[in-house]
């Protein structure tokens, strides 16, 4: 059996003191605790650490830039795989080329230890980033396909209803192969890019 860990970086209130020092201190403590636990998990043989991307989730999820966290983790761990669980994909959050670049950068830094999971986000996040909720599924699927295309082609271009991307060399490139595999829960569709023969996912009902 292979065991994974999932982190949102909870920073529960109350945060004693005055803003902004109280928030900064609480977040620093939560990140430090997470890093300590993940480094121990690496030594104990856990398989993957998954970090979720969320925005504005006060107290519950303060991990808005998992690529930055994974970049740091890549330098203080040796074997544990680094999972984006999930990376928000509808057009409006992050341009697909930037997603391809940041995920591949972590893959290079970690010597091929990246797992890439994707999602559509929550209505609260979509509203703040100007994402059309009704189109979010179609936009996410288009963005995912374009990212994989950028990894699989030396000079990639993409033209669709949502994106016009000219021919460019997107770099760095992922060190791992990409073969899309789709997982669905009753509430949200999750797409994971499989980089190995083994891959599993458990979603809440």
Where are these regions (language model features)?
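Short, surface-exposed connector motifs at secondary-structure boundaries
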Residues: 50-53, 79-82, 175-178, 197-199
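Conserved strand-turn element in the central/C-terminal portion of the radical SAM core barrel
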Residues: 83-91
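Internal, glycine-rich beta/alpha segment that forms the wall or movable "lid"
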Residues: 9, 92-205
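Active-site oxyanion-binding pockets that recognize sulfate/phosphate
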Residues: 23-24, 31, 89, 130-133
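A structural signal for isolated positions on well-ordered beta-strands in alpha/beta enzyme cores
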Residues: 4, 48-50, 83, 115, ...
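Short, solvent-exposed loop/turn segments at secondary-structure junctions
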Residues: 55-59, 90-91, 125
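N-terminal beta1-alpha1-beta2 module of alpha/beta enzyme domains
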Residues: 1-76, 80-81
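Short His-Asn-centered micro-motif
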Residues: 59, 85, 184-187
């Amino acid at each position: 059996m292979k065991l994974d860990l999932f982190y949102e970086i909870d920073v529960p209130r109350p945060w004693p003191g005055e803003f902004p020092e109280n928030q900064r201190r609480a977040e620093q403590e939560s990140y430090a605790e997470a890093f300590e636990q993940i480094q121990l998990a690496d030594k104990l043989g856990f398989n993957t650490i998954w970090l979720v991307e969320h925005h504005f989730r006060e107290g519950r999820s303060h991990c808005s830039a998992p690529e930055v966290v994974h970049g740091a983790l890549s330098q203080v761990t040796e074997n544990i795989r680094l999972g984006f669980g999930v990376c928000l994909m509808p057009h409006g959050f992050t341009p697909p080329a930037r997603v391809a670049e940041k995920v591949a950068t972590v893959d290079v830094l970690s010597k091929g230890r990246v797992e890439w999971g994707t999602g559509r986000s929550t209505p609260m996040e979509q509203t703040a980033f100007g994402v059309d909720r009704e189109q979010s599924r179609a936009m996410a699927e288009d963005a995912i396909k374009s990212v994989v295309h950028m990894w699989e082609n030396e000079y990639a271009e993409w033209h669709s209803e949502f994106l016009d991307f000219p021919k460019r060399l997107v770099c760095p490139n992922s060190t791992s192969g990409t073969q899309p595999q789709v997982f669905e829960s009753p509430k949200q569709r999750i797409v994971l890019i499989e980089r190995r023969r083994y891959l599993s996912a458990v979603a809440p009902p």
